[in-house]
Amino acid sequence: MSDNDELQQIAHLRREYTKGGLRRRDLPADPLTLFERWLSQACEAKLADPTAMVVATVDEHDQPYQRIVLLKHYDEKGMVFYTNLGSRKAHQIENNPRVSLLFPWHTLERQVMVIGKAERLSTLEVMKYFHSRPRDSQIGAWVSKQSSRISARGILESKFLELKQKFQQGEVPLPSFWGGFRVSLEQIEFWQGGEHRLHDRFLYQRENDAWKIDRLAP
């Protein structure tokens, strides 16, 4: 098969979106109410990693980067995730705290995008979550100098075994280079697939202490 033939096959991959629409009259005043409903439905549908979200950041050269992390908490203050503070994303957030999040719930023909500003969590918040993680995950946080180059996986595995022995007694301490971010809720867009590509999109935009809701063309 030539490259052109393969491209033609990819170009014809499509499906119809038939799971239902989203109407203005059905929208709650608070976007978190709708987000919670959709997240609950994603969990009930047994989607793989329903809390997985794409975090988009920009570096000092205006180059965008994306990666998938897990949502660990949300409320009216924002959406929370945790990471190595020496990671690429953490450095980029330090340089430019404006980020976007995307929840891609393909099976439900839905996606949610959040735009806001990321800020560091307090040490108390981070410590509380860190010690709720499985012990091996706590040790794993110590192992990796995230985004650095390594020659082989064996380096990580050896370090893990070394630290597992070191921390076999008592609590695993919180690494100073591990933390979390809360992304404020400035804009939240809900997308529901529709027939004939007439998708439903609604944008919640914060204005003072209220939310303005607009329908967007697909």
UniProtKB/Swiss-Prot annotation:
Enzyme class label: oxidoreductase
Keyword match Transmembrane helix: no
Entry's Gene Ontology molecular function annotations: FMN binding; pyridoxamine phosphate oxidase activity
Example GO BP: pyridoxine biosynthetic process
Catalytic reaction annotation: pyridoxamine 5'-phosphate + O2 + H2O = pyridoxal 5'-phosphate + H2O2 + NH4(+); pyridoxine 5'-phosphate + O2 = pyridoxal 5'-phosphate + H2O2
Required co-factors: FMN
Annotated binding of substrate, by residue: R14, R15, E16, Y17, K72, Y129, R133, S137, R197, L198, H199
Note accompanying the cofactor annotation: Binds 1 FMN per subunit.
Pathway(s) annotated for this protein in UniProt: Cofactor metabolism; pyridoxal 5'-phosphate salvage; pyridoxal 5'-phosphate from pyridoxamine 5'-phosphate: step 1/1; Cofactor metabolism; pyridoxal 5'-phosphate salvage; pyridoxal 5'-phosphate from pyridoxine 5'-phosphate: step 1/1
InterPro entries per UniProt: Pyridox_Oxase, Pyridox_Oxase_CS, Pyridox_Oxase_N, Pyridoxamine_oxidase_dimer_C, Split_barrel_FMN-bd
EC number: 1.4.3.5
Source domain of life: Bacteria
Keywords, alphabetical: Flavoprotein, FMN, Oxidoreductase, Pyridoxine biosynthesis
Claim: Cytoplasm is one of the keywords in the record: no
Classification via PROSITE patterns: PYRIDOX_OXIDASE
SUPFAM superfamilies: FMN-binding split barrel
Binding positions for FMN per the UniProt entry: 67-72, 82-83, 88-89, 111, 146-147, 191, 201
Gene3D superfamilies on file: Electron Transport, Fmn-binding Protein, Chain A (2.30.110.10)
Complex formation: Homodimer.
Job of this protein: Catalyzes the oxidation of either pyridoxine 5'-phosphate (PNP) or pyridoxamine 5'-phosphate (PMP) into pyridoxal 5'-phosphate (PLP).
Similarity remark: Belongs to the pyridoxamine 5'-phosphate oxidase family.
Name of the protein in its database record: Pyridoxine/pyridoxamine 5'-phosphate oxidase
Organism the protein comes from: Escherichia coli O1:K1 / APEC
Organism placement in taxonomy: Bacteria, Pseudomonadati, Pseudomonadota, Gammaproteobacteria, Enterobacterales
